[in-house]
Amino acid sequence: TVAGIVRLRVPIGYSQPKRGWVNPLREAWGLKAYQQVSPELQARVCQTATLVPSYEGVAELARLWDCEVSDDLVHRHVQEMGAKASRLGPLPAAPWGSSTEFSLVIMMDGWMARERGPDWGVSWRRKTTERIAWHEVKSAVIYRLEQAVRTGKGRGLILEKYIVATAPDTAPVDFGQAVRAEAMRRGLGRAKRVYVVMDGAVWLWHLARDRFAEAVLILDFHHAREHLQAVGQALYGEDDQRVRQWVGPLITQLQRGKEKRVVKTLEELLSKGRRLSSAQRKVLQREVGYFQEHQDHLHYQRWKRSGTPCGSGAVESLGLQLQRRLRTCGQFWKRPGLTHLLRLTVLFKNHDQNVLWN
């Protein structure tokens, strides 16, 4: 237990209906047969395992509770409870809380997890081996707009947010279903407005239009800026000063509600640019198409005035947090181990651990 080893003498009896010996107290406490770790200790080591870089680190921290556990014990219980969490059906609806009107913000993105490839264990001297495999973990952050505040020093802060993170290679359709289910738990059906913020990945936009048809879709401002930067670099190469001089005014126009002028500038540059090289023209055609497709998702001045986020920093921050645990030096995961720990991480971050430890 969290208080060390506790030995109890308890009565047991023979059950005629069960035709075996039973331990009523063990059953009343919810302990399985031969279980030697209390539910509270199990919950603590599992939660700690989602925060520190290794199972060995969990064992070291447990000693601060005067509790001697091994990293093998931690690993075993993380995998046991993570597997149980992965088998859970739809979670119960969250309490509604305040009845005042609110807006809901949904941000989606992905990051790459490092797993053991099909040739894991084969000598690195063989050049054709696939020892390491990279697969995308799709993630989302959901929060009420009114929960976004600023500190005294002006730093942005979200008071209460919820996350979705699915196993590597989860299909976009299944990820979209998971995001919508979590959004419904957090008030999607009651929200006055819904904003979906994301980068330009095609699968994200298909998902958003399919699952959140009535939402306001917003292209992450920093990704829009990166695409303008790509045009500037195609035109002026390594001349950073000329690139900044060309890109700067267009970024300012985006910020000041002149997004149509930005799109028109790019279109004119493509149509009148007779001296463009084939490589420059290829980049321009790609970026003009990009901004034409997203010209209804660029109203940054309007959204900023209403307090609506124009960037997907919250979900990118989530990706970095997960990578600090799941992609540190020397970590090469098997799929079950990664999936189980990821599932526990989501439960703890969403304060849903009571479905496993009540």
Q: Model features per residue range: what roles?
A:
Residues 1-10:
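N-terminal juxtadomain amphipathic helix
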Residues 12-358:
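Catalytic center-proximal scaffold of phosphoryl-transfer enzymes
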